[in-house]
Design a protein with these regions (language model features):
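Histidine-/acidic-rich catalytic cores in large beta-rich domains
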Residues: 48-90, 94-126, 148-150, 154-565
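Solvent-exposed serine/threonine-rich low-complexity stretches and specific carbohydrate-binding patches
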Residues: 129-144
Length: 565
């Protein structure tokens, strides 16, 4: 699977297809976002085979469509089935209860339950012929050692025979093992279990964790999937439409998008415990969401009423109470920036909202512990910090080139000053807020995928002269995007470019993620993601499978405290 070559050779070959990918990606996103949420997508239970791992009988529950998987009442019925099996058996290790993906939320996973005489911890190793081994330390409680062990094992290779070896270790270090065999179902989204891997010039180690691919459009069934460092798909979460945007963790819960209207919350065993529906409140989700300090979801949204009345899209933020499910709008950028809306009247022509009015196009939201939020506006190439989100929303600052806001009301007063001479971000995505204990109070970092794409359909007469060496949606050989990192100093009202890297060009979507000393970059329209070392040398690049393949984001999670200790 690995091929030694220079990574830029691949980049040159696939760069020419970016314009086609951009068009297909944007049009398919729009079509999918417009799908009727009530349309039933037929569900067929995939075949798993094993004498050691049981498949539940769902005939009395009625799982007939993927929508049924995200029905919390049906999920509760599944939990009752599992509880009945636990009560009916005597599962003292080495006797165990093993179920194939009982909650139907992770295609290749296995639910495992047993008890031990002594307090113990559990680790496991998964082996499959022709694939590297996968290891994990099971997380069944907050304690390191327990007598009751209930967890979801992930890391199985789809459609082939896997051997899982469970190792139970007591406090004295005594080990007992049990081996099971299991052939999981095939993936519902991809034909292949592997991604093509190309090693770069760096010999540095990759970070631990699983790459999580969001919004791969070249799939037979929409899903978010996990990829290990060797390019093996180790997990798959089927969804209804759109993409999952990101995984957000809170105690023993994980949140992810399942459609353009819904976010699901699952527990460590894979059970869907709640589904939050903004569609019933008159909104659609897009791009991103996060949690605030009270445990509420903050999500970027489109008002269905504003879209129907004014063709206006992607300029709202809603708060979702995770206890009650109540949806409340906390930001309307037309009300916040009326002078911009009077000026930026052009209609989208090439993106997923062609024919719509999209003067802000929010694509990232980050929550700051002081109660403020940082959002990214692609259309204005501006990063905005906003305060008083619960009351009267107010602007703290903008980060952009001053030319963006020159002559637009008094908004130029909010633009921070550049600390040195550099070109500001353009069409950015995946903006991330980072605190650092070595910095003074009022200082922090912001890093982003700087698309370097000059696209602003809402203001077709905009002067781009402040952005030399920038590119349009018409990708050509030699175009590039950037990873950009700023030091923001609110005390001085400045921002400074402290790190930058030229990366393969992507006019839209895309993500970056700092992981210790390493950097993960996903130029979405290129269909690749790459991990770099601290010197910005390529360690390894992964190519998504399929023709014209694109992705929305790729982040890497270690799943510690959720699946693993």
């Amino acid at each position: 699977m690995r091929k030694k070559s220079l990574i830029w050779t691949i980049i040159m070959l696939i760069g020419l297809s970016s314009i086609v990918c951009a068009y297909l990606f944007s049009q398919s996103l729009k079509a999918e976002a417009d799908q009727n949420e009530d349309k039933k997508t037929k569900f067929s239970l995939s075949v798993a085979t094993s004498k050691d791992v049981e498949v539940l009988d769902y005939s009395n529950i009625g799982i007939n469509a993927y929508q049924d998987i995200f029905n919390t009442a049906k999920q509760a019925q599944i939990a009752q089935l599992i509880a009945a099996k636990k009560a009916a058996g005597h599962y003292k290790f080495p006797q165990i209860l093993a179920l194939s993906n009982p909650y139907l939320t992770n295609t290749t996973s296995v639910y495992i339950y047993f008890e031990t005489e002594k307090v113990s911890k559990v680790s496991y190793q998964i082996s499959a012929a022709g694939y590297p081994d996968f290891v994990g330390e099971a997380n069944s409680s907050e304690n390191e050692y327990e007598t009751t062990h209930e967890f979801q094992a992930i890391g199985f290779v789809a459609g082939v025979k896997n051997t899982i070896t469970l190792t139970v270790t007591d406090k004295e270090g005594n080990e007992t093992t049990k081996t099971l065999t299991y052939t999981p179902p095939k993936l519902v989204s991809k034909d292949k279990n592997t991604l093509e891997v190309t090693d770069g010039t760096s010999e540095k180690a990759l970070t631990s964790g699983l790459y999580t691919v969001f919004g791969d459009k070249n799939v037979s069934q929409r899903a978010t999937y996990l990829v290990d460092n060797d390019g093996i798909i180790r997990g798959e979460y089927p969804i209804l439409s759109y993409n999952s945007m990101r995984f957000v963790f809170d105690e023993q819960s994980m949140y992810y998008g399942i459609s353009a209207e819904k976010i699901a919350r699952i527990n460590q065993l894979g059970q869907v415990e709640q589904v939050y529906d903004v569609g019933s409140a008159g909104y659609n989700l897009h791009h991103d969401f996060t949690l605030d300090k009270e445990g509420n979801l903050l999500a970027l949204a489109t008002s269905e009423e504003a879209e129907e009345k004014d063709n206006l899209v992607e300029d709202r933020i809603v708060q979702i109470n995770t206890k009650t499910g109540k949806v409340k709008q906390i930001a309307d950028f037309k009300a916040l920036l009326p002078d911009l809306y009077q000026l930026a009247t052009g209609i989208e022509t090439i993106t997923s909202y062609a024919g719509k009015w999209d003067p802000i196009h929010l694509n990232t939201i980050q929550y700051v512990e002081d109660g403020s939020i940082i959002v990214s506006s692609r259309e204005t190439s501006t990063i905005m910090k906003l305060s008083n989100i619960e009351d009267a929303l107010s602007i703290d600052y903008f980060i952009s080139d001053e030319s963006v806001w020159k002559g637009v009301g008094n908004y130029s007063n909010f633009v921070l000053e550049k600390e040195s001479d550099f070109v500001s971000q353009l069409g950015q995505h995946s903006v991330t807020y980072v605190e650092d204990a070595t910095l003074e109070e009022g200082q922090y970092y912001l890093y982003m995928f700087n698309n370097n794409s000059k696209i602003m359909d809402s203001r077709t007469n905009f002067d781009w002269s402040a952005y030399p060496d920038s590119f349009s949606d018409q990708s050509t050989d030699g175009d590039y995007s950037r990873y950009s990192k700023y030091l923001v100093d609110e005390n001085k009202g400045t921002y400074e470019l402290v790190d930058s890297l030229e990366v393969p060009y992507s006019a839209f979507v895309s993500s970056v993620q700092e992981m210790g000393d390493n950097l993960l970059v996903n130029p979405g329209l290129q269909g690749i993601f790459t991990e770099y070392d601290k010197n910005h040398q390529v360690i390894r690049t992964y190519q998504l499978s399929g023709n014209g393949v694109t992705s929305y984001r790729v982040y890497k999670y270690d799943f510690k405290g959720f699946y693993f200790k």
